[in-house]
Amino acid sequence: MLSLLLLLLGLGSVFSAVISQKPSRDICQRGTSLTIQCQVDSQVTMMFWYRQQPGQSLTLIATANQGSEATYESGFVIDKFPISRPNLTFSTLTVSNMSPEDSSIYLCSVE
């Protein structure tokens, strides 16, 4: 059975907002799902979810506004990467049906 190593990083302090992301890393089995939480210490309008695959630059997955559906970038779909944004300080990204191609660094950022 193939295991996938994921590094999950938050972009520390941005414009005086402190971001924490959990879990900080995880190893997942093929076919499983992983939910990543992003918590901000102040209310923010927009949250962004990124992925960085080995040897590649950061790629924006989606932008999440509180109270509305996330806006996905080309190549990313809600079925694979569902995002929740229940309030102005919290968001989750789920990576569904994990495969070797999902081995990446995932991170959130705010504006």
Swiss-Prot record:
Q: Does the keyword Repressor apply?
A: no
The UniProt keyword set, sorted, is:
Adaptive immunity, Cell membrane, Disulfide bond, Glycoprotein, Immunity, Immunoglobulin domain, Membrane, Receptor, Signal, T cell receptor
Among InterPro entries, the record links this protein to: Ig-like_dom (IPR007110), Ig-like_dom_sf (IPR036179), Ig-like_fold (IPR013783), Ig_V-set (IPR013106), TCR_beta_variable (IPR050413)
Disulfides per UniProt: 38-108
Kindly give the SUPFAM superfamilies that the UniProt entry links to this protein: Immunoglobulin
The Ig-like domain sits at 17-111
Q: What does this protein do?
A: V region of the variable domain of T cell receptor (TR) beta chain that participates in the antigen recognition. Alpha-beta T cell receptors are antigen specific receptors which are essential to the immune response and are present on the cell surface of T lymphocytes. Recognize peptide-major histocompatibility (MH) (pMH) complexes that are displayed by antigen presenting cells (APC), a prerequisite for efficient T cell adaptive immunity against pathogens.
What protein am I looking at? T cell receptor beta variable 29-1
Give me the gene this protein comes from.
Answer: TRBV29-1
